[in-house]
Amino acid sequence: MAASVENRQFRHEPGLSAAGVVRSFSPNHRRSDSPIRNCNYPAAAREFMTPKKLPPETYDTSDDEEDEADYRDAIKKSNSELESSVFDPRDQGTADQWIERNPSMVRLTGKHPFNSEPPLNKLMQHGFITPDPLHYVRNHGPVPNATWEDWTVEICGLVKRPARFSMTQLVNEFPSREFPVTLVCAGNRRKEQNLTKQTIGFNWGAAGISTSVWKGVPLVHILKRCGIYSRKKGALNVCFEGAEDLPGGGGSKYGTSIKIEMAMDPARDIILAYMQNGEKLSPDHGFPVRMIIPGFIGGRMVKWLKRIIVTTPESESYYHFKDNRVLPSHVDAELANSEGWWYKPEYIINELNINSVITTPCHEEILPINSWTTQRPYTLRGYAYSGGGKKVTRVEVTMDGGETWNVCTLDHKEKPTRYAKYWCWCFWSLEVEVLDLLSAKEIAVRAWDETLNTQPDKLIWNLMGMMNNCWFRVKTNMCKPHKGEIGIVFEHPTQPGNQSGGWMAREKHLEISSELAHPTLKKSVSSPFMNTTSLTFTMSEVKKHNSADSAWIVVHGHIYDCTSFLKDHPGGSDSILLNAGTDCTEEFDAIHSDKAKKLLEEYRVGELITMGYSSDSAASSPNNSVHGATNYLTLHLSLATIKEIAPTRSVALIPKEIAPTRREKIPCKLISKTSVSHDVRLFRFALPSPDQVLGLPVGKHVFVCATIDDKLCMRAYTPTSTIDEVGYFELLVKIYFKGVEPKFPNGGLMSQHLESMELGSSIEIKGPLGHIEYMGRGTFSVHGKQKFARKLAMFAGGTGITPDLSSDASYLKDPEDDTEMYVVYANRTEDDILLREELDAWADKYSDRVKVWYVVAKSIREGWKYSEGFITEDIMREHVPEVSEDTLALACGPPPMIQFAINPNLEKMGYDIKNSLLVF
């Protein structure tokens, strides 16, 4: 059904007192009762209803009082027919699991952090005021679990009277303003840019926009109270800083700044907001206090506000420079970093630009063509907005590519401020003849504001994908919704997040396919009602192809048959099989290069039918990944002699043999962190149930998954804990800090994220993955084929010791396993040797079975009795067994070590590295 925007003119009730719309507060995060719902005030809130004596310069709120009844009526309407928020299962195991959220919100960055927008048609159905649960959300990390009583906001820097205000002081000691403001993310409509060329941002659709009635303290009053200095004394910028601890820049708060002229301008209506739509802020929207800067992008409106600092330079926050910029189109990520484009002030975004969107017809809406529909006009609808308080004065629609334009009817539901500013979106509509739609190939819209700014015809790409405001185009196609009847199906350019659909996605993949000259690919469509010869499948059909006999995956709405690639996949066949029969868009994008993405096109067999289907990735369902199933039953039987595990003991990583369609990410909470050295940490993570074992076969590893800087990051790790540990597993991780290694100035993304994690926060794991599995007593399974050895030449470099360690531990626990292990372990210095105590203890206790030899690039202590330099042929001949039928070599370490030291020297020793070398 087409989305519609009702005509909701405000009623004017001049007799309503100011107290009639004051909202109550409770000291916790749950939404308080409100007089809008005819509820009684709690005693603690009565202080807010008592008129306060204000200084003579207090802002005159008489106009606000006249509008309050209008706001109340609009809020009531917007909240009607809104489903309740719930504790979403997708938040379980994350730092946000205590927050209730609306289940219809479209998640854009997986499970965590929570970045979301409402379905576009649902957003418009609620009209001018957006219900708080449907307001778009932009979070960079976990939501602070704040309390009203303990929260303070510090004012410092270039002020005469630095102060720290409690929430009670902000409410009682300052005048307040309450008025509607439209908030828009600078990334609104970014997915259109990503489908032109990938940016560094995630996929916002066209619903990264919302309007609320905000109430708070004018910033200018707070700065005056604290005695802000003049420009002559260096006060040039006002910086805002939030409470959350974020990974950006190696660890920082979210912060930004505006010029002092903006901060002190009463016409800007900048407030410290503590109420939204008549109630205290919800956690996702900044409880207990946030900035509202009307007419600006949402990225300047710091949530969970903790500090306001008046400074000479602009904010030095990582997020002030590395976010919310529109760089020239030729600047890519490498150039931006190498030439310092992030720090050029002319590319910062403050005020919104002019923009408009078609919301009716909605995506994949079908208009039947019959005697009834052709006798009456069809109404096109949408929204428009501009920045800086500029009024939208005109919206035009074209159905012939811009040759002619039709002027639309505008519906401005707000009154101008006393400074003639317009802070909210407006709605537009246009009646068109259905016969005109029949002849149109597309419908496009553009808006104008009072300074005659308008939207460009074509998209202008930029690295961050921000401020996209080209004409919004809806394509039309003929279809047959019912037998003997024709209709028009409408197609929006994109669908938000990793949802499939949209004419831009279809054209993008057709373009790629044309470049690859794929002979069998037909034109694809996203609607099942179109009369077409292309192969389309439902998700239920895809799920049937979840085995080695037929392994299908879905990526960006396109279906790929990877069966023939199983044997060639670098990560082994189970790297694909764990994913077979699922939509793995998010995780595929997280770990694959552009080369791999182009290679994937060779295996495309059709398109996913998207109508009525929400992809697993878009919904952050746990059943998406890119890697690995394992033969758990064989492992369990083969290693039963190591240690008996109760038959009823559950495992966290459920094997494919037991649950072929279950491929879940497992949330695991950090319960301890031990510093092993200056850059090595031992992390212990709790499994979901205290009586579980991890269930990871020896030799396999897991993916650790986290959303970092709004993108899914996945890294493979081998736990150092033994397979029979109950309730937890451990990871030994080397932290690659920013600014230490010149070749990698930004350091390790995942390792720094793990380092920044607080106890109680969570990551997700998925697996098992890997093509090598130790079955016990000298037997390995490699790509499903068995190999046997009595002697193992084991080479490790740096953190590559962890797979060897897990293997060693399992060998030594089985008294019947007489496999001999010869370990050569390379590091930079003695201090970099991991788990040396364990290795030396094993070599001492099992001297007939375990030999360990260390190699360091440079010794930093006297008396070093092992090798110095690199692994050489002489070292290998002296410390690993000669080639024989019952000898295997195992290696895990940096690629240069394996390529230039291990491989050539093993060949010199007579090893067949193709068949006798296993690389983890």
UniProtKB/Swiss-Prot annotation:
Gene3D superfamilies: 2.60.40.650, Cytochrome b5-like heme/steroid binding domain (3.10.120.10), Nucleotide-binding domain of ferredoxin-NADP reductase (FNR) module (3.40.50.80), Oxidoreductase, molybdopterin-binding domain (3.90.420.10), Translation factors (2.40.30.10). Residues 663-775 form the FAD-binding FR-type domain. Keywords: Disulfide bond, FAD, Flavoprotein, Heme, Iron, Metal-binding, Molybdenum, NAD, Nitrate assimilation, Oxidoreductase. Residues 1-69 are annotated as: Disordered. Binds 1 FAD per subunit. PROSITE patterns: CYTOCHROME_B5_1, CYTOCHROME_B5_2, FAD_FR, MOLYBDOPTERIN_EUK. This is Nitrate reductase [NADH]. It comes from Cichorium intybus (Chicory).
